[in-house]
Amino acid sequence: MTTKDYPSLWGFGTTKTFKIPIEHLDFKYIEKCSDVKHLEKILCVLRSGEEGYYPELTEFCEKHLQALAPESRALRKDKPAATAASFTAEEWEKIDGDIKSWVSEIKKEEDKMHFHETETFPAMKDNLPPVRGSNSCLHVGKEKYSKRPTKKKTPRDYAEWDKFDVEKECLKIDEDYKEKTVIDKSHLSKIETRIDTAGLTEKEKDFLATREKEKGNEAFNSGDYEEAVMYYTRSISALPTVVAYNNRAQAEIKLQNWNSAFQDCEKVLELEPGNVKALLRRATTYKHQNKLREATEDLSKVLDVEPDNDLAKKTLSEVERDLKNSEAASETQTKGKRMVIQEIENSEDEEGKSGRKHEDGGGDKKPAEPAGAARAAQPCVMGNIQKKLTGKAEGGKRPARGAPQRGQTPEAGADKRSPRRASAAAAAGGGATGHPGGGQGAENPAGLKSQGNELFRSGQFAEAAGKYSAAIALLEPAGSEIADDLSILYSNRAACYLKEGNCSGCIQDCNRALELHPFSMKPLLRRAMAYETLEQYGKAYVDYKTVLQIDCGLQLANDSVNRLSRILMELDGPNWREKLSPIPAVPASVPLQAWHPAKEMISKQAGDSSSHRQQGITDEKTFKALKEEGNQCVNDKNYKDALSKYSECLKINNKECAIYTNRALCYLKLCQFEEAKQDCDQALQLADGNVKAFYRRALAHKGLKNYQKSLIDLNKVILLDPSIIEAKMELEEVTRLLNLKDKTAPFNKEKERRKIEIQEVNEGKEEPGRPAGEVSMGCLASEKGGKSSRSPEDPEKLPIAKPNNAYEFGQIINALSTRKDKEACAHLLAITAPKDLPMFLSNKLEGDTFLLLIQSLKNNLIEKDPSLVYQHLLYLSKAERFKMMLTLISKGQKELIEQLFEDLSDTPNNHFTLEDIQALKRQYEL
């Protein structure tokens, strides 16, 4: 009922407020009225009492309005402010006590501040700078105009205008102006450069420093740079800040005090690495000190951060022009020196000079060396660079810049490699071994690399990059035979580019190095740093996470991941992980730690004969070959052969943690849990924080039904790396099994005894202690040789429970796919809700899994429940990789799908029609 249903026919008038007809203030009208807004107006009029006080009618209106609109604002009632009478005695005593204690604390704080002001600031009055007054203004010719002329000047004759020289008079005016603008700086000597901050709080120091800095800014803007330096110095003495150092550096540049400005810039970069203003100002000081290469580096870093910085672009062009001019001049001088060296053939220091000559990149002659030097250097012609982490080798202050040490042998910055690679490198180097002194020549890749290492250590990164580029050019024709050596050279050149600020060049070289040697730690780290410098935080995060898969104990990568995760959270919100590119899974074959027996042998037996070196190289080669064969066997799921390969590796070197963890993985795949646990124990003795060892030992304990120990190890894994989702899922599974074991211990024991007897009959004495009842799904999923380990008549079937998440479903379906068990797969589909199928499959839909699902639906499920088959086919088409899978299946598999749809069409059912089947066939591109 609305207001239009009751027109004002009786003429009783309307209310003053809202103009409501009087007859609407009635029980019957209010009871039938459904207009909430009108009822609110009526209630407002009744409460105001302008038409009389009707408590029952008001209450009735409130109840009716509450029934129609419980959230109506008109139902709210004003509540008076609480007083002491509103509380109990205990409550009021507590409130009153809190207020009194707060008042007393505030008074104490005020007294402290007052006492501090009266005690501290009088002592500082002597140290404060003078108040600016008339005496600090510019003295514009005060003495010249202070005295009155005693006699009036007589007017000049008109003839004197003929002698008037306009140019001279203009010159006098200019000189007079310069004299007038001389600033009186006598007051600067009275200002002390330091402020006494004894007894001041941090807030007061900050206030004083800010005030002095603002004074310096005023002086700088007025052109008085000396006064600006003075006030900036006072600000720094009160509280050193990046802004004050930066401003003082700019003022020093204006005064052309290059050394002071350089020191201030260095201080800024210590406090805030990567500060753009400091880099730009340090580049200016480098330019005026004729340190052009250093200026180029700083300007490149500025342009990487701010590509549109016009001042940096202009300065860089000037520096590059000066650098080209200086290089042209130095080349002319060098050529003259080389002519002198070539003329003197029998000088005593010929060897040293010719060595310098070839290091400079010119000349055709080689330095005279003993005949054995080339043979001694041959095994390490293209050795590996020393295995130092980027954070340690390149962190800290920049090394002192200077000329590289001359006359170094190729071993100075390189590890040893196999003779086969050495010979390949020598062949690629253009016959470096063809001359007696081919160990250090410019055509020798090892010599170029050694020179590059020395230049890098001395801080000459551009020259080092040139040497590495020359070595790469010599080795590239050799092809994949020396891929590892080329990868090292690309990685070294990437380090040079990273130091120079050429991040794009660094990324390109790291990509090339990773193509030649996948999952190499140094290129991954350097590429991550370059991405982070370019503010491509997502790509940097992925690279750091990949590095942590190789070595989880690397502190540099851990810190970077934590820092980047916070940045990405701020940029992309809580769902930032969804925007990342997928993190590549590092194969189990990639070792956690690098081992270099040849390097150890050289460090211990530096003076041994070449036969000992050859033995170390042979051991390393054998070890590496066996490990790679074992890794390949793991990739092929041939775990027994991989087991023997890793065991052979441990005979050569039993201190390699990665071999123990890899062999433990093989034992887990073969369900030899006790042996897997022992290998994990050995790995943890070598590296007590190894995540893989803890995780695999937890799986071994789970297989041995030691759920409590498995729980402890999984908690350690999550503590070391909370991002491992598999560990969290395993933790949930083990917790569930532990609770189940506590509840049904007698039944579990009977079941266990019965299954042990079956295992002894079927599998003999190979695995006497294997508990098959609680075999981990990971073991079943990854066991490719399932058919070979069981006889075809084996009656044991895989126990299948309803999966709760994608991980459990994936483990079960992988195990079924390995066993080709269509009946069990049909049972799994029967207990799985079709709508959950896309979520469970996730992005793991593979060809063999897809074929197994289709075969199970066709052979085992269509006769029992056609509607369930239709639902599964419908939701299977919504899986992530479904469209891609359709492009990869064979013609025979397509015919199998067509037969399934034909059987589905021939089966009558009320849950779907022929049109539905035809539409679904179009989804399957049939």
Curated annotation (Swiss-Prot):
GO biological processes: axonemal dynein complex assembly; protein stabilization; single fertilization
Start and end residues of each stretch annotated as Disordered: 318-452, 758-801
One Pfam family cited in the UniProt record for this chain: TPR_1
TPR repeats (start-end): 209-242, 244-275, 276-309, 445-478, 487-520, 522-554, 623-656, 657-690, 692-724
Biased composition (Gly residues): 428-441
Record field: compositional bias (Basic and acidic residues): 352-368, 758-769, 784-799
Tissue: Present in most tissues, including lung, with the strongest expression in brain, colon, kidney, and testis. In sperm and testis, detected in particular in pachytene primary spermatocytes. Up-regulated in pancreatic tumor tissues and not in normal pancreatic tissue.
Keywords attached to this entry: Ciliopathy, Cytoplasm, Fertilization, GTP-binding, Hydrolase, Kartagener syndrome, Nucleotide-binding, Phosphoprotein, Primary ciliary dyskinesia, Repeat, TPR repeat
Leader sequence residues: none
GO CC annotation terms, alphabetical: cilium; cytoplasm; cytosol; dynein axonemal particle; nucleoplasm; protein folding chaperone complex
Alphabetical list of PANTHER family matching this protein: RNA (RNA) POLYMERASE II ASSOCIATED PROTEIN HOMOLOG, SPERM-ASSOCIATED ANTIGEN 1
Disease: Ciliary dyskinesia, primary, 28: A disorder characterized by abnormalities of motile cilia. Respiratory infections leading to chronic inflammation and bronchiectasis are recurrent, due to defects in the respiratory cilia. Patients may exhibit randomization of left-right body asymmetry and situs inversus, due to dysfunction of monocilia at the embryonic node. Primary ciliary dyskinesia associated with situs inversus is referred to as Kartagener syndrome.
Name of the protein this chain belongs to: Sperm-associated antigen 1
